[in-house]
Amino acid sequence: MVLADTNVIIDYWKMPDDRMTEIFNNEDIAVCGIVEAELIHGARSEKEIESIKEAISCFEMLSYSCNWEKLGRMLNKLRSSGISLPFTDAMIAQIAVDFNVELLTRDNHFKLIQSVFPELKLYPIE
């Protein structure tokens, strides 16, 4: 199973390249609530929200109860290492680590997280 980040889902929907098509066709793709929320946040209408919900229904939803202390410690360690990033990216990384799945993303923030937390596994896109 591979946890897909918001950016790769949007890229796949808007401009799928051969590599993304291969990944989405051959891997068990999962999303989490944060990714769902980010996708819905970007919608321009109720109709688009419904389309998003229908499109992501084919992915496995990773249900997650956040360990807030663990997340806080992750963010603290990242900040102490000079790394500042969006809160949502840290949460997505924590979910990937806790579920022991690779994260499919094109966002370089996750490489920074991985430099401090090598247990975060990134799916090779290129």
Each predicted region: which residue ranges?
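Short, well-structured N-terminal submotif of metal-dependent ribonuclease cores
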Residues: 1-31, 40-53
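Histidine- and aromatic-rich ligand-binding microenvironments
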Residues: 5-7, 31-32, 84-86, 107, ...
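Short, conserved catalytic or interaction motifs in soluble domains
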Residues: 15, 61, 115
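Amphipathic alpha-helical recognition patches that constitute DNA-binding helices
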Residues: 19, 91, 109
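A general structural signal for well-ordered alpha-helical segments in protein cores
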Residues: 36, 49-52, 68-72
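Phosphate- and divalent-cation-binding pockets in alpha/beta enzyme and binding domains
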Residues: 38-39, 70, 112-113
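Active-site neighborhoods of divalent-metal-dependent phosphate/nucleic-acid chemistry enzymes
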Residues: 61-106
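Acidic, PIN/NYN-like endoribonuclease modules and their adjacent C-terminal/linker elements
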Residues: 100-126
